[in-house]
Amino acid sequence: MKRFLMMMTLIGLVGNWNSTLTAQLVSPDSLYLNEDLPEINIVAVKPLIKAEADKTTYSIAEDPDSRTYTLLEMLRKVPLVTVDGEDNVKVNGQSSFKIYMNGRPSNMFSNNPKEVLRSIPASMIKKVEVITDPGARYDAEGVSGILNIVTKGAEFEGYNASIKTTVMNLFKSVGGFATLKYGRLSLSGNYTFSQQSSESESDYLRTQSEDGGKLRMLSDVDVKYPAHYGSLEGSFEIDTLNLISLSGNLNIGNSNSIWNSHYSRLDKEGEEIYAYNEDMSKKNEWGSASLKADYQRLFKRNKEEMLTLSYQYDYIPNDIYSVFYDKDKMGNVSLPQLEADYTRQISHARTHEHTAQLDYVNPFTSIHSIEGGLKLIRRSSTSHATSEVKELDEGVWLPADLQPLVEYRHVQNICSAYAGYGFKYGKWSLNPGIRMEHTWQDVTYKQGEGKDFNYRVTDWVPSWTSAFRLDDRSLFRLAYNLRLRRPNISYLNPTVFVSGTSISYGNPGLVSEKHHRLSASYSYYGTKLNVQASVLCTLGKGVIDEYLFIDSANVVNSTYDNLVDVKAAGGNLYLSYNPSPRTSVSLNSMLHYLDLRAQEGNEVYDTDVRNSGF
């Protein structure tokens, strides 16, 4: 007779029985089990930060704080991103960066970006990518880099919806986020209404180097910002190789501000030349709306080979309605702007932007890859502004003597092509690339003073990134790129805005800034300790700067020009430590040395004018 020995083992339990069985079926003896292990908890911390050759990624969705925080609050945790006490966002210590949504430039951040970031709940964001060294496939604009915000889609079959409200001293919002996935169709949508208020006081004193005179302005400002933000995204998977995506974003709002100011002009002896008080009410209605369509094609021979066709339309309105009341005039106030008690200025600006893009990427071996693409952007901006005055509260509005009407059109076309190569072998990776951007723009004045002009330029933008991965958690990176900063319509608009004895206007003759950047960084991201340290050098030519001057009529003029050359060197340090699953400590710091010098050949500053320091 054959005999069999059966042993039974259960995790966490120990048995004290075994039985010898024959081929004949028999009933086994009683089985006794005792507990062998006490209760245990296995806790794994998923890394929130990932360092790659060309970017650093923070996983917002994996951070528990994303359930209650806004996107602006979460940015305080992202390496190389700083948010100051007034909620101004900087990347690599600079505010001249571009914000992308899902890998594409987004114009909804062009007006009041911090208000938009505050209105977006972090629960709808998947991750934030900090691209400090953009490669050839990215637009050349954005001096300090690109902040790419990747939103969540519908990840699971079915639907999900959430509602959120935020109440703070000067800010409140309410909104919702919903997703739907049904077979090959995915939809997600978001809407938020926000209301912010701010009150501030300022004391401004300016000394003129030419005559030693002084200009002083005391102001009390009360501003309210109601805004609406919404987005809708959808995708349909035709088959395993073809995907169609549609999306739209809407961001509209207005700011209502009340200014109470006191202006005074003093000579070098401290004697008052003139003084007056001014009350100003201003309403600014702004917004952006965008529609985007993408077609993505994968190839059977290599599922990582991809062709993408994209089209995007953006509409950006900006209307300003201002009324000034000048009173309590003392001294020499015979300036044209102050002859009337009331001044009214109305400005209507519109921008229509069309973008078509083709991208191709092919990692044809495990070591080598290539990418390339074409892009065409057409921006058409119009501005219509009027300026009127009247003597008394019940008087009739009449055209102002100083630029009563200006109407002009600004058309900008940017055609670009790029090519890049990728090499990855073992722990080494290398990504050189080149991008060509040809810009041509035309400015036409339909009414008012102004001379038509056009501008043509071709920029070659090289980029290079190399990386060495020391192990699974640490990475060393060295990179160089050239970045551009093009002036937007607010810098170019020649419309004169009058405020008492001050006027401000744009300069349609501005050209793009160029910034060369060289950086080196080390990253270590573990389960508890995260470190990213970087050093960088920047050389900027023809940086756009605002400058003020007082003309012969004692009027303060404010405008812009390509005036400054910048040299900068510094470092950034990011540290975060998680001693326990519920405790975290982080440090996001930077130290930069700046050397600012007047550009040779400029007509505003002497060439020996400079400023430097940390």
Describe the function of each predicted region.
Residues 71-74, 113-115, 130, 140-163:
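N-terminal periplasmic accessory domains that precede
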Residues 229-231, 235-253, 280-444, 469, ...:
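Face-selective signature of the C-terminal outer-membrane beta-barrel domain
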Residues 71, 77, 104-132:
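Short acidic/polar hinge/loop motifs at secondary-structure boundaries
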Residues 440-442, 472-517, 537-558:
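Surface-exposed extracellular loop regions of Gram-negative outer-membrane beta-barrel proteins
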Residues 72-108:
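Extracytoplasmic beta-strand/coil segments of soluble accessory domains associated
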Residues 218, 353-355, 399-405, 505-507, ...:
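Outer membrane beta-barrel strand-and-loop segments of large Gram-negative receptors
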Residues 25-64, 84-86, 92-96, 131-133:
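Short, acidic, small-residue-rich periplasmic hinge/interaction motif at the N-terminus
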Residues 170-197, 213-259, 287-291, 297, ...:
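Transmembrane beta-barrel wall of Gram-negative outer-membrane proteins
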